[in-house]
Each structure stands twice: as C-alpha cells, then as structure tokens.
Amino acid sequence: MAEYIEVRVENLHKWGLEINMERIEKLSKRLKSIVDEDCIMKTSRIIGIWMFMPEIVQESLKDSPLMTQKAWIIPHEKTYKTIYGKDGIQMAVTQNEEDLFKDSEFFMISRCDSVMLTKNNKTIILNKELLNCNMSEDMLFNMLSCQEQDITEELMKKMKTIISSNPKERLEDKTEEVFWNSTRILNWIQHNDNSRSNSSDNSFRE
C-alpha cells in the first residue's frame, strides 16, 4: 500500500482554486478514496494539479505522509532525480522544464509513473495514465485555470514524445540509496535550484 499526498479543502483557496463544493463532492466520489470530510484526494496516482510552493505544501502536508519515502540521488548537472515509492511507484523530479524536455535521455522517465516539475514556485505532478484519457472531461483537470490547463496539455504532449522515443537508461551514476521523510523531500524541492551537488553533499542528511 502506497503512502499518499493529502489535499485538504480548507487549503484550496490558498492555492488560488475556487471552492466549489458540488464539484469537490463529485471529484471526491470519483476518486473513491476519501478519508474524512475535509480531504478531497488521497491517492497514489496523482493525475495533475498545481501547488504553490513552499508554504502551502508545508502547511498542508506537514503532518501527512508523502507518497515517497525512499529516493535515489542521481548526480547530474541539471539536477535530475528519481524518487521511488514504497510500492514501487517511481516519480521523476526536475526543476527545469526546458531541460527535461530537451534531453531525450532524461533519467528513467520511460519507467516512471509520474513526473513532477517544480518551476517558479509552482509544482505540477503528471501521471502517465493521463496519456490514455480525455483530460477535458476530468474533474480535477477542470479545477485548474485556463492557463494551467493549457500548460498541462502542452506538458502531456511533450511527455508523449519523450516516452515514445524510448530513451536510454543511464544508471551508472546512481549513488547509494537514502531514506527521506516528507520534510526532507520538501526541503529538496525548495532548494532544488541550488542542489547540484552529488550524494557527498550532506545538506539534507539527518
């Protein structure tokens, strides 16, 4: 069983999303994974949502488990990283969208379940299952602004191109496995643009 990211209704307005209770109720029923009345989403398959970083994520998730606790640090000049979930879920993480989509050999993206991009204090998490569905009919997708919908659609197009190109895996540079709690993962996201060092950097070690 995977650990999860929780998104609480009480924090939605801080994300710039209108709190439409009817829409939230439909979304909650659709996801079928409600744990209490103030949680609209608890799923290991995040299908795409923008989050403002870092305060909102810290506040929303500080007492909640993240989907991932174990990570492989992959030293790379563009600071790519792949995070592994407890049940084998893999998420590719990068700070720079352009670097991600220009590099046809992005580490392990063909095997990842999700791709998380952090840029300009925003984070988007994309799931490959979106490649096979009609995003315009998705309740969560419809909660995004028009601009965010356009960006998400464009990212999915680029993602399809990369996946279809069947990039090579280059794992010779992977380092030792390290265990990260949610705070350490959030700290890495916040400092991603400054974390170009390899595993010898102890900045986030406990």
UniProtKB/Swiss-Prot annotation:
It comes from the Viruses. This is Uncharacterized 24 kDa protein. It comes from Citrus psorosis virus (isolate Spain/P-121) (CPsV).
